Amino acid sequence: MLRVPDVKASLVEGAARLSTGERVFHVLTSPAVAAMVGVSNPEVPMPLLFEKFGTPDSSTLPLYAARHPELSLLRIMLSPHPYALRSHLCVGEETASLGVYLHSKPVVRGHEFEDTQILPECRLAITSDQSYTNFKIIDLPAGCRRVPIHAANKRVVIDEAANRIKVFDPESPLPRHPITPRAGQTRSILKHNIAQVCERDIVSLNTDNEAASMFYMIGLRRPRLGESPVCDFNTVTIMERANNSITFLPKLKLNRLQHLFLKHVLLRSMGLENIVSCFSSLYGAELAPAKTHEREFFGALLERLKRRVEDAVFCLNTIEDFPFREPIRQPPDCSKVLIEAMEKYFMMCSPKDRQSAAWLGAGVVELICDGNPLSEVLGFLAKYMPIQKECTGNLLKIYALLTV
């Protein structure tokens, strides 16, 4: 926690308002969140999220609401616990005695787990512009415990809990002095830590070779709970079932985990939130170098997946903006899972007729996933509605389609 040394500071819409009129707030780096709030820059001021969802609280933002399905998408992008519905995004705290405190990085708070920092990179910034368009990043030194600001009214707080008491016993023996090296004896200037900190060894997927090796390893076996980190195992397992509804490559003999991995490698290549690091912790220790033809095939799969997702979003934009004069009264002859996925997708968008858009969208997405050329699908749509050639928010829609 970082203390705001201003006696007249207050929390307003996710930011600390100072006595000088300036505001201190968090700026998170996420292209998907930027697309959600309508910002062209990937750096998103946190108060814009509070303003978009109109929360009455000035320090916390609920991550679930029945009337705001976009909050669920925001929870998936930010929270390390994406399936904890009763959770809140917390930027800081304000008390009458201690004043205003800001988290160094916003945390997700819930009854089922301890406070956990959000996933995207985040920094503190300050501005006097209430629209948050022009701001300056605050550089925090290592170990800093307060926000370095120039306020007219500062608050001094004495932390009594930091006091230490040491009692000396006159009967106790004198402490032994450490053995000092002899004069002239050389000593190493290297510093060695006595305590060995055990950290999880995560293999980062920085090359196509590693990603291709991971893809084929996932095809050979499923992760085992006793041999895997529990948090990453649960994340991958739950997302395989709940956020993997659309199979964009149905004619290939791939398991569901391989489909999920391909989607998140594509998300990573686009700079969007993904769980590739979770796959890395589950399979990274067993990677073997991929062969040349395996890397080429894996790259071709990614290109095919990207093309089909972009084609699907292009067609769904046309369906979204079309005012159906007569509603579609019969669902398409496709899987129920795909229809439900389209219903969830159009809950995040705002079509003119949600049910008709979901039913028609399911049929169109199935045609694209089966490998039909985009020209043929557009020729079919053009018989019933004008083709929408330009639309905004495509990055967010691609993320929604890959994680629905």
Swiss-Prot record:
It comes from the Viruses. Keywords: Host cytoplasm, Host nucleus. The keyword Cell membrane does not apply. GO terms for cellular component: host cell cytoplasm; host cell nucleus. This is Protein ORF23. Interacts with ORF34. Plays a role in the expression of late genes. Belongs to the lymphocryptovirus BTRF1 family.
